[in-house]
Design a protein with these regions (language model features):
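N-terminal intrinsically disordered, low-complexity, charge/repeat-rich segments that act as generic
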Residues: 1-100
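Short, conserved turn/kink motifs that form compact alpha/beta structural patches or helix kinks used as
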Residues: 34, 107-151
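A generic structural signal for short, non-catalytic loop/turn and secondary-structure boundary residues
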Residues: 71-74, 107, 147, 158
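Broad hydrophobic/π-residue packing in well-ordered secondary structure
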Residues: 73-83, 114, 126, 162-163, ...
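Short linear regulatory motifs enriched in tryptophan with gly/pro/ser
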Residues: 83-88, 96, 110-116, 168, ...
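Catalytic phosphate/metal-binding cores of nucleic-acid and nucleotide-processing enzymes, i.e., regions
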Residues: 88, 105-107, 158, 171
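Glycine-rich loops and low-complexity Gly/Arg-rich segments
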Residues: 105-106, 177-179
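Short, compact, well-ordered microdomains
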Residues: 142-177
Length: 179
């Protein structure tokens, strides 16, 4: 169960093994928490996560399998980073890029924590993500409303980019990921 939860939290497709003739796809974490003792995933999915675990060793700045799936995976995903409590980033929390630059501060990934990863559907834009995480936040989102100084990472399946939420737009941050 612990392994299934770890992989589910990282974004893996997990199936419950029950008395039914075919496995049941897991759509919520609590299904694993209260579900049967047996789980399965496709061989391709298992191999994908084994490769991500191996790739993580090359990048010590990647803190979790969930983050590795976002930054190194080949699926279309997006992630939201918010400033960690008690980090130097608190000095520029909720401040715009102009303020940060004029005060000689630098945006550093180590000041942030990954608070959400989701599927990047169709032609979803940064503005769409901003609207969703301010008006109709997903139930499993545990951060504050998407705000100035947050970072949105987009993985289109081929390229990964980081974007600073500024006062009225988004600014691409090539230095944030440093992969």
């Amino acid at each position: 169960q612990e392994e299934a939860l770890k992989l589910y939290d990282a974004g893996a497709d997990i199936y419950l093994i029950t008395n039914f003739s075919s496995p049941i796809y897991v759509t919520e974490r609590k299904e694993i928490e209260r579900g049967p003792e047996h789980y399965q995933m496709s061989m391709a999915e298992r191999e994908r996560f084994r490769n991500l675990e191996w790739e993580m060793q090359k990048y010590p700045q990647i803190q979790s399998l969930k983050e590795a799936n976002l930054l190194l995976g080949t699926r279309r995903t997006f992630g939201i980073y918010q400033i960690k409590d008690d980090s130097p980033g608190e000095n520029y929390a909720f401040m715009n890029m102009s303020f940060i630059e004029s005060h000689g501060m630098q945006i550093k990934k180590e000041d942030y924590k990954l608070v959400y990863v989701g599927e990047l559907l169709g032609n979803t834009s940064l503005d769409d993500i901003f609207e969703r995480f301010n008006i109709d936040r997903p139930k499993d989102f545990r951060g504050h409303s998407l705000s100035v100084s947050d970072i949105v990472v987009l993985n289109d399946g081929e390229k990964v980019t980081a974007h600073f939420v500024d006062s009225i737009s988004f600014e691409q941050l090539d230095s944030f990921l440093n992969l």
